Amino acid sequence: ASAGSGMYVMTSYIPDQEVVLEKNPNYWGEATNVDKFIIKIQPDANTQMMTLSGGDIDVAMNMTDDTMSELEGAENISIINGATKTVGFVMMNMDEAYGGPVSNPQVQNAIRKALDYTGIQTICGSGTITPYDIIQVGFMGSKGERPADYTNLEEAKALLAEAGYPDGFDVDLTVTDLDMEGILLTDLAQKIKDDLSQVGINVNIVSQPWAAG
């Protein structure tokens, strides 16, 4: 369909505050029974919880395990859980001119072996899994879940030595300040930094605003 042919049109947008969508009078399909949506931009899960509890908003997304547990049993609030297709991953540049050491396949395998996937899942919350690659478990082409015993620091160190980095190296990790389904990517970046320090890789976290792309 052409752009602008949907059932709603954006009538207002205030950066970092709210988006207003109103019924499209020229929509070609079956009419919707909701005239307007006001989408508040509020990345903080605790603030979302308070505004939801106070009746100021009708729906809250990107909630954390902690905030959901506080809302359980609350009057007039329903918690809906479901599987998503969201996959988080670390991209390593294959071009040596830009990626430096991480362009080396052995280094990439060392990084995979050095990460504490159980700890990462703890940060991400209940229900999360670690797939083998970017194809989520349950979809065609998925290799299934990464086994719990995949992490092996000694193997990671050996791979780094074979690649020519027995003492590790310094590397930048660029991460946006996005809250993805209740998970702060900057928190995950700090976890990755801590994990890789165990094998001599010194990670410098470079944070950039989501709006910067």
Residue ranges and their predicted role:
Residues 1-31, 36:
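Gly/Pro-rich hinge or "lid" segments in bacterial periplasmic/extracellular proteins
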Residues 8, 129-162, 178-187:
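Structural transition elements
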Residues 15, 161-213:
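Ligand/substrate-recognition segments at binding pockets and active sites
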Residues 22-25, 84-110, 114:
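A bilobed periplasmic-binding-protein/Venus flytrap-type ligand-binding module shared by bacterial periplasmic
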Residues 24-70, 202:
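Ligand-site clamp/hinge motif
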Residues 46-56, 73-74, 106, 187-199, ...:
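Short helices/loops that flank or line small-molecule/ion binding pockets
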Residues 69-81:
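Ligand-binding "clamshell"
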Residues 99-139, 184:
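Periplasmic-binding protein-like
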